Amino acid sequence: MKRIVIAGTSSMVGKTTISTGIMKALSKKNNVQPYKIGPDYIDPTYHTEATENKSRNLDSFFMDKLQIRSLFKKHSKNKDISVIEGVRGLYEGISPYNDIGSTASVAKTLNAPVILLMDARSLTRSAAAIIKGFKSFDTELNIKGVIFNKIRGEGHLNKLKEAVKYYDNEIEIIGAIPRDEGLSVSQRHLGLVPTPENKQGLLERIDLWGNTVEECLDIEKIVELSDKSFDFCVDEKNKDETLWKVEKNNSKIAVAFDESFNFYYWDNFDAMEENGAKLKFFSPLNDSEVPDCDTIYLGGGYPEIFSEKLSENKSMIDSIRNFDGKIYGECGGLMYLTNSIDGKEMLKLIDANAVMTPNVQGLSYVKGTFEKDCIIGEKSKEFKAHEFHYSKLININENDFSYRINRGKGIINSMDGITSKGGDIVGGYAHQHCIGNPYFAASLSKI
């Protein structure tokens, strides 16, 4: 299986722009499977638009090595090449002492060649030192190439090439991207702006990234390097092991999916469908009522940006308030379930108020334990998740929580998963993944 990892020397070096551009350029002649290392929701939306294949997350905190390999094989088996965008710097993970949660960890697990991406502003000889340092830090990694971003011009590139080749004649110089503010992408408090808000503008930007990559990088060299990757196999003893719990049901799950709610892992949807669920997508912003279903799934997103329009859609609010099935709200979905977001009236199904703050309220990988059976898990079972939010809940008049947070923050006092309506409604800040919480899809899909 051809595969390549695009890894940064740090955050903010242009990983998403250039990785997406590479995916777009390769997609003109290849069936490309995109991946994002880490728990991010937003970068995969760019990958998906560039390749027309759903981008998947690979994460060595949520997943063990066998699960990473199994998931990779599941999605890459019929593809020509897989392009894997890293997270932060190559070696950044959850600890300064190991590589769990890092790009390096996933690259080693998949025996994937790595192309190092660096911001080359004001660098010449130091670029060689950076490359040598990254290569020698962990010799199990297969760092095969380098891309220079934000170069000043041809003279700058020539000096970079001379310096790097003088000290490391084996590294492949894939090319260089010039400084151009037009190539940058908007930022918002959770990272990059999600795509549904400006679809046409985004498609034009992705075309620009793809064209720039074709002009400035050696695409054939990227394919050549990926072709040299080592093969690997899933342990035969575990080849029938499922990645998540499966209990066949015939439930209908209504999934909120629009500009305000779009933070979802596609593998969660796959897991729900494997559990027999039929997914129905709807828009809390634009539709008048929730579709016929057994369960409503309100994912994360930016409801605070659209709070006025959400509040004004009274028919949808009434439809959800009168719904007599199960409702799960996650982060942004939790906020929508409360009485209000920054004073704008919401569903009033959880007695608390959501407010935005200027500072991050929760940013962490999460470990938790279910205190009871609930609509997304089973009592005493442990799970791994992720949280990243600038909002917090105040005036909390609920005291029933479904899970305890052992690593991370949660809603209050290390508790998360506020439960109401006799357990039929659960709202939490922890973003659940069907492998980090293998009971998630089966529990949510129950009738």
UniProtKB/Swiss-Prot annotation:
Q: Which cysteines are joined by disulfide bonds?
A: none
This protein's superkingdom? Archaea
Q: Does the keyword Nucleotide-binding apply?
A: yes
UniProt-recorded name of the protein: Cobyrinate a,c-diamide synthase
Q: Could you tell me the gene encoding this protein?
A: cbiA
Catalytic activity line of the entry: cob(II)yrinate + 2 L-glutamine + 2 ATP + 2 H2O = cob(II)yrinate a,c diamide + 2 L-glutamate + 2 ADP + 2 phosphate + 2 H(+); Ni-sirohydrochlorin + 2 L-glutamine + 2 ATP + 2 H2O = Ni-sirohydrochlorin a,c-diamide + 2 L-glutamate + 2 ADP + 2 phosphate + 2 H(+)
| Single GO molecular function | ATP binding
CDD domains linked to this entry: CobB_N, GATase1_CobB
Please give the record's comment on domains: Comprises of two domains. The C-terminal domain contains the binding site for glutamine and catalyzes the hydrolysis of this substrate to glutamate and ammonia. The N-terminal domain is anticipated to bind ATP, and cobyrinate or Ni-sirohydrochlorin, and catalyzes the ultimate synthesis of the diamide product. The ammonia produced via the glutaminase domain is probably translocated to the adjacent domain via a molecular tunnel, where it reacts with an activated intermediate.
UniProt-annotated catalytic positions: C331 (nucleophile)
Query: What SUPFAM superfamilies does its record include?
Result: Class I glutamine amidotransferase-like, P-loop containing nucleoside triphosphate hydrolases
Where does this protein act, in terms of pathway? Answer: Cofactor biosynthesis; adenosylcobalamin biosynthesis; cob(II)yrinate a,c-diamide from sirohydrochlorin (anaerobic route): step 10/10
Q: Which PANTHER family match?
A: COBYRINATE A,C-DIAMIDE SYNTHASE (PTHR43873:SF1)
Species source reads Methanococcus maripaludis (strain C7 / ATCC BAA-1331)
